[in-house]
Amino acid sequence: MKPLSSPLQQYWQTVVERLPEPLAEESLSAQAKSVLTFSDFVQDSVIAHPEWLTELESQPPQADEWQHYASWLQEALSNVSDEAGLMRELRLFRRRIMVRIAWAQTLALVTEESILQQLSHLAETLIVAARDWLYDACCREWGTPCNAQGEAQPLLILGMGKLGGGELNFSSDIDLIFAWPEHGCTQGGRRELDNAQFFTRMGQRLIKVLDQPTQDGFVYRVDMRLRPFGESGPLVLSFAALEDYYQEQGRDWERYAMVKARIMGDSDGVYANELRAMLRPFVFRRYIDFSVIQSLRNMKGMIAREVRRRGLTDNIKLGAGGIREIEFIVQVFQLIRGGREPSLQSRALLPTLSAIAALHLLSENDAEQLRVAYLFLRRLENLLQSINDEQTQTLPFDELNRARLAWAMDFADWPQLTGVLTAHMANVRRVFNELIGDDESETQEESLSEQWRELWQDALQEDDTTPVLAHLSEDDRKQVLMLIADFRKELDKRTIGPRGRQVLDHLMPHLLSDVCAREDAAVTLSRITALLVGIVTRTTYLELLSEFPAALKHLISLCAASPMIASQLARYPLLLDELLDPNTLYQPTATDAYRDELRQYLLRVPEDDEEQQLEALRQFKQAQLLRIAAADIAGTLPVMKVSDHLTWLAEAMIDAVVQQAWVQMVARYGKPNHLNEREGRGFAVVGYGKLGGWELGYSSDLDLIFLHDCPMDAMTDGEREIDGRQFYLRLAQRIMHLFSTRTSSGILYEVDARLRPSGAAGMLVTSAEAFADYQKNEAWTWEHQALVRARVVYGDPQLTAHFDAVRREIMTLPREGKTLQTEVREMREKMRAHLGNKHRDRFDIKADEGGITDIEFITQYLVLRYAHEKPKLTRWSDNVRILELLAQNDIMEEQEAMALTRAYTTLRDELHHLALQELPGHVSEDCFTAERELVRASWQKWLVEE
């Protein structure tokens, strides 16, 4: 234990003079001297009750002793016969335990988290014991309150604020709300009361027992102002009245207060669960709620003004960077996202802060700085209050109390303590300002030129001049003014509430200022106003853009770069949430992490809620697609990587859809019984075309076929038994349904299953044996070409190995070169006649001569032609690696393979970028002439010449 500092050693002599004879100096331990020097509250308490000091010396406080509070208190109350006796015992018990907590805290015998837990549990124990004693007494006097069925009705107490969060201060008010379940009357009393009367009277007595000062002090100051209608409302409300209030009139700040609400005492009963379930939707919205930001900022502004008005300087709770700002930071995430992230629904601050870090909503460094600052500030606050059991958060001005705090906080002196304190509070303030901003500093609103507001507010005509647009060309200036005017007219057709109008009026000057600084102002503004028209009636999205300037900047740059992204954001405003974090926005998920991220994402949705599952799949896909496109636009992903990401994303979606369909089918029919003898599900999904070849684009559909290995005689083992092969057919149908169902978030993917054996006329799902037989005996050459770009994208190892073997066997069949050349060339000519360019003087990048499809046909032809001699050619299903294999196996010269690869990736890159611009896949006839000549020459060499 650290020895007392010099000023405190001097003060000890003053303490000694106050001590009574039984507490002679020589009989005291060094620990006792330290605590008595630090805390006047402990000093006064042990002078009045010397036996408490003896107990402390012989039985020092333990971290887990809060578990005994209830039994200790019951023992103290066992002989209480009247309310006066109850009040006395409650006060003495509270004081005795608070002395023990102060002792443990001063000497740092337990952690600060443990101190907060002990303080909160002590309050809960005292409240519940007082309530239960009074309930019995009131029932004896007035009868037992019952509902219409004659069931006894309890009084439930919601502990709010720090009490609810398990984070009570040393000297603190307690904020409570009283409720009872159902209406009815008392039974068994001398006269009948309705339940409202009974619980109101009981509530009044409970407040008096806890709050009224006596010669023994008080238990806690009770604050009931958080209840519905505050001081003007009923003291106690029924569940029905509570529900009506919060649904109809609950205000933002009441939501914030309710985050920490906790039912005191036994919280596992039927009524407790009912109350919790009733309040949860009010507190945690299912949608992301950005209105929180402005409300919290307004509250913070009110507090800051109060600090100034009351001269609350050096206030570690309410000042800049203080405890309240940490609480606000945590609550922002809870209230914005808590409805969708169960881990954010904790009442306690520190677990919620850990969840925020785990969800990457704050950086680990920021979260750790907040955690350390919070524990530092809470220890300082509790030590400060324990000096005199006084409710204060203002740092002392006198030398003695400064010396006390410096010593207890383990600093050499006061300047050293305040230096560390200042650093902690600066860290908190930085995070707070980055997240919530601060009305007290010069805001964007104040610094923004009045002229931008005029541009938005005044209905300017196309011919009007305005200085802020002087840098634009005349055409662009007219276009911008016309777009603003058209947007304002569009707004008049929509129902926008006063809050939405207020947010829009705040947002638009900032948006116009940023957009009009660009050279492409008119084009960008046209895309953004189209998006805004779709969200103006949904204030939460306007608030997102208004509250997060960085999100607005990302929106502008992405919409400027890509109308496809602008369209996606307009159709699915939920994606605006992705703009908040540039670290993830321009950094797509690692290619091997899509499955895992999707699995975690779906854990938030009930497994049996198909509608929510479908929405979640689509929302995940769109968010990931946006991130890939943003990285593509930013130039951080080359074309090959864009396709890799799009392909891995699609595979993750296939995995999740099959899993969902499987669970639904097994629940209905049971599993096919042949699976009892083997691992896996006996099912595979094969990807063809762009999916099989790792070459997906932004709007590619999925070419899929479904395989199973179910024997003819297999049956399912569920109550509704069906044929095993029928099970797999229904599974495949279910998968198609899950992909194609249109929800508010659109469809998942267009799926084309026509490449299956016998095409659209064939069975949707095929047995592995039938697939092999078809490929060997019935398939056309073009179907073998398609097999070159096929691979299993979902399936158990057995079926995957079987498919790979069939594919390899078919591709390595000996083929007569001339016949194959003719068949491949004629198929290409048919395609060109059917799908070729219908636009004069334009080059269709994919379908025209010298385009992407020609390269694909060249590689497919060469694999089918030479794989019999060089089986290694069957290894890959994508064109780039096939071209590498052709060079490595001396079929194509390396220079030609590299040139074709460059041409192929260049053309695909252009297709990606045209898709981002929502443009068709054709360009001017004079584009890519070198690449086209190269491909034509290669085509001539391999597929025309003898």
Swiss-Prot record:
Stated name of the protein: Bifunctional glutamine synthetase adenylyltransferase/adenylyl-removing enzyme
Transmembrane regions listed in the UniProt entry: none
InterPro entries: GlnE, GlnE_rpt_dom, NT_sf, PII_UdlTrfase/GS_AdlTrfase
Top EC class of this enzyme: transferase
GO molecular function, one term: ATP binding
Keyword match Nucleotidyltransferase: yes
Name of the gene this protein is made from: glnE
Key word Glycoprotein present: no
Domain of life the protein comes from: Bacteria
Family: Belongs to the GlnE family.
Cofactor list: Mg(2+)
Keywords: ATP-binding, Magnesium, Multifunctional enzyme, Nucleotide-binding, Nucleotidyltransferase, Transferase
Pfam families registered for this protein in UniProt: GlnD_UR_UTase, GlnE
